[in-house]
Amino acid sequence: MNYCKISFYFLLSISLSLFLISLKFLLKDLVYFIEWEAWVFKSMSIVMTFLFDWMSLMFMSFVLLISSLVIFYSNQYMEEDYNINRFILLVLMFVMSMMMLIISPNLISILLGWDGLGLVSYCLVIYFQNVKSYNAGMLTALSNRIGDVALLLAIAWMLNYGSWNYIFYLEMMSKNTEMMIIGGLVMLAAMTKSAQIPFSSWLPAAMAAPTPVSALVHSSTLVTAGLYLLIRFNILLTDWWMGQFMLLISGLTMFMAGLGANFEFDLKKIIALSTLSQLGLMMSILSMGFYKLAFFHLLTHALFKALLFMCAGSIIHNMKNSQDIRMMGSLSMSMPLTCSCFNVANLALCGMPFLAGFYSKDLILEMVSLSYVNVFSFFLFFFSTGLTVCYSFRLVYYSMTGDFNSSVLHPLNDSGWTMLFSIFFLMIMAVIGGSMLSWLMFLNPSMICLPFDLKMLTLFVCILGGLIGYLLSNVSLFFTNKALYFYNFTYFAGSMWFMPVVSTIGVINYPLKLGLYSYKSFDQGWSEFFGGQMIYNQLKNYSLYLQEFQMNSLKIYLLSYMLWFIVLLMLVVLVN
């Protein structure tokens, strides 16, 4: 047995065990806080602390479940790769870093998991060794460095207090102005890791990694680390300005990602932007105070998003590494099993009734309708929901229907049983996971009382979004691309509001150009004129001038004596 199967059975067994334990913790409301003295030397001790409650155990079980299926899926997807064992070890290191982050109530150990995620994600993004992967890896690493610095500053600031265990200070953080600095730094760290505006550009760039990594990273590990950290610090968001600021940023991120996905043609980038949109949704509902609801959507989203990426990986695998949806078409005839699961995941993403996404998204929108939010935030929530249906319908229309648009030599069929097993397992979870979790997590159902038109607004927005997606995608012979009429808007929306340009060229090229301009203007310009050359010439002229006075000529001395004598004589005459 190779590393894939051993890791699969090991992680799956631990996942099922942790899920059952988390249910016991949830029903009995248990919390275990464990301190392990790792090293003691006289009066000094190094203590590792772990926090086990139903939230950490359930999240760990989902991370391990998806990781085990991703590793099993990789056994066939990466079978032609010479370094598959190295790949599996990197994925296991990634999972270990995530688990360290989940169970840590201490900012120091959180930083270990946080930095582990950043380092291993860089290694995975540059796994396919080419220039595009190197650029994407560097953008990912440098964007996440900002969050690492914020966490380090929070650790340094907590030196003013008694401990790095943040759970001791949560009540104090929301009331004490000095402790709110820690909250602001943690929020900045979460924004970078969960790719909120203005740190969104690294998330689509990270698609340079292998597709199994994308399924793991964008469902339950890297991008959700920041969100999970904020769920732990949720009491901070009860502060007015922090909650309002986070609501605005996450709402704009959700809207920007949904808009950008409608102008994208790369299959993996569309799903990545979909992840970004759902992260914005989770962040925004968390900033309104519904941390349990955000965690619920985090778990359901992990199921259908991992399924989406696995189906996309199977399609790319069969399309000989082509990711352009314009080159696809009629895949439902060639790959019926994969496309069926792909459609289930898409419907769950859109919030189709009784699938996983419905139980969380519908409840989120109902709670938004019940809450005191302004018109702008209300518009962002519902318009972004319509955009989700729009790009999902567009994706299905381009890839599943119509005629096949690629090479006729492509031998298209469903993948082997290894990949299909992981896909089918997640498909079952995407169907039953939402209802199961809602019954387990919310023992007391929420009382929703809304007018009929507000209750039906979600359904209306979804139908309208699907219709717009159909109209955007419906092309025929002699069709004029409407996007060309609004090219500036299309370019702006399709490039994530110019954020990748600002994050790369803006950070590198413009300072370099400013430095070149300064070098030309000052160092080789006025500084050269007023600097070395000018001083040299002036000193030379002064020295020549003084040299004339020191020639020791008797005629000059007599002349100067006579001139001064005449001047003094004239002064005496004038005075008298």
From Swiss-Prot:
Entry keyword annotation includes Translocase: yes
Enzyme Commission number: 7.1.1.2
InterPro entries hit by this protein: NADH_DH_su5_C (IPR010934), ND/Mrp_TM (IPR001750), NU5C-like (IPR003945), Proton_antipo_N (IPR001516)
Topological type in the membrane: Multi-pass membrane protein
Gene Ontology terms: biological process: ATP synthesis coupled electron transport; electron transport coupled proton transport
Source species, domain of life: Eukaryota
Transmembrane annotation, as ranges: 6-26, 46-66, 88-108, 109-129, 149-169, 179-199, 211-231, 240-260, 270-289, 294-316, 339-359, 363-383, 423-443, 459-479, 492-512, 556-576
Any one GO MF annotation of this record: NADH dehydrogenase (ubiquinone) activity
Keyword tags: Electron transport, Membrane, Mitochondrion, Mitochondrion inner membrane, NAD, Respiratory chain, Translocase, Transmembrane, Transmembrane helix, Transport, Ubiquinone
Coarse class of the protein's main subcellular location: mitochondrion
Record's keyword annotation contains GTP-binding: no
A GO cellular-component term linked to this record: mitochondrial inner membrane
Enzyme class: translocase
Pfam families (UniProt xref): NADH5_C, Proton_antipo_M, Proton_antipo_N
Catalytic activity: a ubiquinone + NADH + 5 H(+)(in) = a ubiquinol + NAD(+) + 4 H(+)(out)
Location relative to the cell: Mitochondrion inner membrane
Family from the record: Belongs to the complex I subunit 5 family.
Function noted in UniProt: Core subunit of the mitochondrial membrane respiratory chain NADH dehydrogenase (Complex I) that is believed to belong to the minimal assembly required for catalysis. Complex I functions in the transfer of electrons from NADH to the respiratory chain. The immediate electron acceptor for the enzyme is believed to be ubiquinone.
Name of the protein described by the UniProt record: NADH-ubiquinone oxidoreductase chain 5
Organism expressing this protein natively: Anopheles quadrimaculatus (Common malaria mosquito)
Lineage, opening ranks: Eukaryota, Metazoa, Ecdysozoa, Arthropoda, Hexapoda
